[in-house]
Each structure stands twice: as C-alpha cells, then as structure tokens.
A protein has these predicted regions:
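Catalytic phosphate/metal-binding cores of nucleic-acid and nucleotide-processing enzymes, i.e., regions
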Residues: 1-143
C-alpha cells in the first residue's frame, strides 16, 4: 500500500509541475484532506475551477480509464461545484486527460446560474492527449 501511495503522491507532484510549466499558473498544491475525507480530489486548478483526480497504474486495460475513476472525479467535483478532470497514465504510456463534454462543447454547459452540470449528457467523458488538454485548460483559464 505504501508503494502505491508514494506512486500516487509522486504523480500528483509531477502533474502540479506540468500545470505550472505549461499553463504558467501558480503550482497547484496537493489536497492533503484527500487522505482523510472522501470526494476531495487530488489537485485544484484555476481558482477552484477544475478539480483534478490523478491515477497512475502499471497495468493497462487497453489504455482506457476505469469507469469508477471517472465516477470518483465527478463526485468530488460536484461536491465542491468544480469541473471534474481525470488525469491518468499507465506505465510506458502518455498522460491522458478526461473532461466532461461540456468543457469542449459549451452548448452543454448551462445547468443553472449557480453551478456546473453534474449529470446527463453534459458529463459524457471526452479523452484527450496532453497537448489538447493544455489547449482546453488555456481556453478556460484565460491565460
């Protein structure tokens, strides 16, 4: 368990540095409460806009993410009124980013004036590579 926890912590730090370098934002800090509370997410990016859930695993099931990872990311983001993002990587494969479709197609974005969509078609997952993910973040963060 300790090795997997260390692997997760290391991956969160790696992503934090990536966001700082690629997006020019202050390095997102790890959410230490995540070890004591459920639905906390791993990193927060963009003044409480994106809640990042990071997953780093050795074995790949075709390079695709596990549905329970996406469910975890959505649940944590909904609890804090943020946009969920799942970032995952299997050994010897590149990072993949999973966004809800409303981040890519704003027509799905309108839920109500006080929050982001949390269910339905607006939450359909869209998987992109790192280069596209950074473009998406830049659009939303208005850097």
């Amino acid at each position: 368990m300790t090795n997997s926890r260390n692997k997760g912590v290391s991956y969160e730090r790696e992503l934090s540095k990536l966001f700082e370098a690629e997006l020019g934002v202050e390095r997102p800090q790890r959410r230490l409460e995540q070890t004591r509370e459920v639905d906390m997410g791993d990193l927060v990016l963009g003044d409480d806009l994106f809640m990042i859930e990071a997953k780093r695993y050795a074995a790949s099931s075709g390079g695709w993410f596990r549905p329970e990872w996406w469910a975890q990311a959505k649940s944590a983001a909904a609890k804090h009124n943020m946009i969920p993002v799942l970032v995952y990587r299997y050994d010897r494969l590149p990072n993949r980013f999973v966004f809800p479709i409303f981040v890519i197609q704003p027509d799905y974005c309108v839920d109500d004036q006080f929050g982001w969509p949390t269910e339905g078609n607006a939450m359909s997952p869209v998987v992109v590579d790192q280069e596209v993910a950074m473009m998406v973040f830049r659009e939303w963060l208005v850097i």
